[in-house]
Amino acid sequence: MKLVRFLLFPIALLYGLVMSIRNLLFHCRIWTPRRFQTPLIGVGNLATGGTGKSVVIDYLLTAFKKKFRLAVLSRGYGRSSKGFVLGKADSTASTLGDEPFQFLRKHPEVTVAVAEKRVEGVEHLLNQFSKTEAILLDDVMQHRWIQPHLLVLTTTFNQPYSQDFVLPMGNLREWRKGARRADIILITKTPPKATPADRDRIKQSLKLASNQSVYFCATAYAKFIDGAAHKPLVDIAIKKFILVTGIADAAPLVSYLKGLNFDFEHLEYPDHYAFSKATVGRIEHKAQNTFILTTEKDFGRLQPLISKKVLLYYLPIQLKFLNAQEEQAFLLQIEDQLQ
């Protein structure tokens, strides 16, 4: 392992240098980000994935969609389409991407769109939906051509960006100091047993600026499953099942299900995995005498491919703050920008 890290170190330095030059060009206004009058709330991260950005977007939609006319703009990673695409009733995970399709399915009253070029995406949204009061920008941390009014950076408790390194030696898309652009740092996936001392240790390692806020939150799993039917989670304890995941970090989910003493076989695939008919056929073969449980994100990709004879469920998740005061402070900080 030390040899591998040694060999990757020069490549990481070169990659980091390129990102530093890029950020410097924006910092010196040689390249100028576009700022819109309509409030833009950005959510992003420094790491390559698995920090809970989508859960944060979902949380914000749930919290504010009844008070404001919201839209969501994402890149639509892994989609088969190109350019600006507006989410519609006949959209799929293939045409929109996993996360945008999930937002569209869960929040049909919200405008959802995808575009590689976010500036053009925002322009399209505002031209087509002139009454839009705010736009949530998904995965926008490194998309410097657009300037959010407020930027939320997500990083996990067990692997904060302060303990990581740039690609390919580590998982960071840019150097740690890029976090200075964020207004809010959300420490996601905080363990329930984390003590105040543990949280203070994380805070100190981040070396926050005076204008930055930090909040700790966890992933809360629903007490029910959905999909083939809506039923209590405890009902699946009666037999062994197949767990299928295609996300960046399935470890917390696996740990949670094992903690409930559920008996299952885990079929793990890479993040945003494009399930083929052959792969789905093998999954169905394993699930002949049982059912399949998956994540809400993977459900959108699997559902069109899975035979209706096979029971396919997903376990919803949501963002949960460690205390009500922190949650209220976070919501007020967001709402101040939406007003």
Give residue spans per PLM region:
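Hydrophobic residues at beta-strand termini and immediately following loops
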Residues: V43, A113, T155, C217, ...
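Residue-level signal for inorganic ion chemistry
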Residues: L14, S54, F103, D138, ...
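Conserved beta-strand elements of the Class I
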Residues: A71-L73, L153, K240-V244
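C-terminal accessory "lid"/substrate-recognition subdomains
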Residues: K2, P160-F291
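Short, flexible loop segments at boundaries between secondary-structure elements
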Residues: A220, P270-A274, K309-Q337
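A transmembrane-helix-recognition feature enriched in membrane-embedded lipid enzymes
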Residues: M1-T38, Q337
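Phosphate/Mg2+-binding loops and adjacent switch elements
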Residues: Y77-L208
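Walker A (P-loop) phosphate-binding motif
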Residues: N23-A89, P191-P192
